[in-house]
Amino acid sequence: MNIVILGTQWGDEGKGKIVDMLTEDVAAVVRFQGGHNAGHTLIIDGEKTILRLIPSGILREGVLCLIGNGVVLSPPALMEEIEELNAKGIPVTERLRISSACNLLLPYHVALDKAREAELGTKAIGTTGRGIGPAYEDKVARRGIRAMDLLHPNQLLEKIKKATAYHNIQLEHYYHQTPLDYQSIYNQLMEFREKIKPMIGDVSALLGNLRRQNKHIIFEGAQGSLLDIDLGTYPYVTSSNTTAGSAATGSGFGPLYFDRVLGITKAYVTRVGAGPFPTELTNEEGKKMAKRGNEFGSVTGRPRRCGWFDVISMRRTIQINSLTGIVLTKLDVLDEFAKIHLCTAYRCDGEVVNEPPFDQSLLESCEPVYEEMPGWQTSTYGLTDYSEMPKEARNYISRLEELLGVPITIISTGPDRKHTIVRQAVFNQVITAKG
């Protein structure tokens, strides 16, 4: 069985924990888009591990970890991550494979990203400044440097020379920044070449072999669906496609080979950086939510904006991803709230709407229409049995399923992989506890 697991909001939904939990049954985990701008936080027996590029299956012995062609790969970031894992006694290089078609993220991408955000000032998009956008620009413009280029040093030198000259024109003459030296960039890549070279290969072919052997494969998304470059809250989005279709194009695996699509969603909503957020709470409730949820970016450390669950945006996410199941995370964050609110419609320019507008100026003006439910005000932290869940919490989950039309198959009640209620087994159709 082949399963896509992705975020349904603006990222930070807890995908890493769920992927890690499910990898006990899989042969491989694939990253198919994004870069090192988002981190997946895993907590195993109290020990925290943050992964940025390497798939979350790396913490499971014997699981093959694949970086697909849809990822933009920073060699220094990758090597740093490998070294961090090795220091914890986790071997990486024997189980990690990088698509030869994967584009590399290089110093001029980072320089451009930072220069652009600085120029925009208060109107900045709110990127992480790690060069993701410029790297994808080079890919689309067909001037990108790919992992396979590391195998041909002479050709690589010429490509680096041309690309650096091109980007230096912008850096020096438009942004008034110091130009970069192509030879330094090339020399740095040569240092990484010998370490990365054994891991470069044909990821699409590997996936095909696993499929023919009827092995289980997980395709792990980064960021969230509302950050999709085409279908998200543009222009306040990331530079890749974060929705389910990208699992195919970003890995070289045919779309008809996917069996399920699981959407990870918090029991509330968070967002980092600028952009519309209809249910955002700027009052004490929002601060309480952020504190209880420890809502700070795992890579950037930036505080996350918090708000109530948005049924309207979630329905859009279900539609664009063809979700077959939902994983509800961080339910325990709501334990102390006397009242829980669900946004069931928007009021835009005096009109009640049930679909999120793609026009961001209109979305900015939308106000949430709430349905109020009683809170449970008792701890759900660490629960593993649905029958032990407070009645009010079960009512909240049932109401979400009713409004969304998709089953909530897994509930996360804490950060550790053990803090989980499995209502429906992922790799078969057996219902273990419906409640």
Swiss-Prot record:
Keywords: Cytoplasm, GTP-binding, Ligase, Magnesium, Metal-binding, Nucleotide-binding, Purine biosynthesis. The keyword Magnesium applies. Pathway: Purine metabolism; AMP biosynthesis via de novo pathway; AMP from IMP: step 1/2. Mg(2+) binds at D12, G39. It catalyses: IMP + L-aspartate + GTP = N(6)-(1,2-dicarboxyethyl)-AMP + GDP + phosphate + 2 H(+). Substrate binds at S298, V299, T300, G301, R302, P303, R304. Homodimer. Plays an important role in the de novo pathway of purine nucleotide biosynthesis. Catalyzes the first committed step in the biosynthesis of AMP from IMP. This is Adenylosuccinate synthetase. It comes from Coxiella burnetii (strain Dugway 5J108-111).
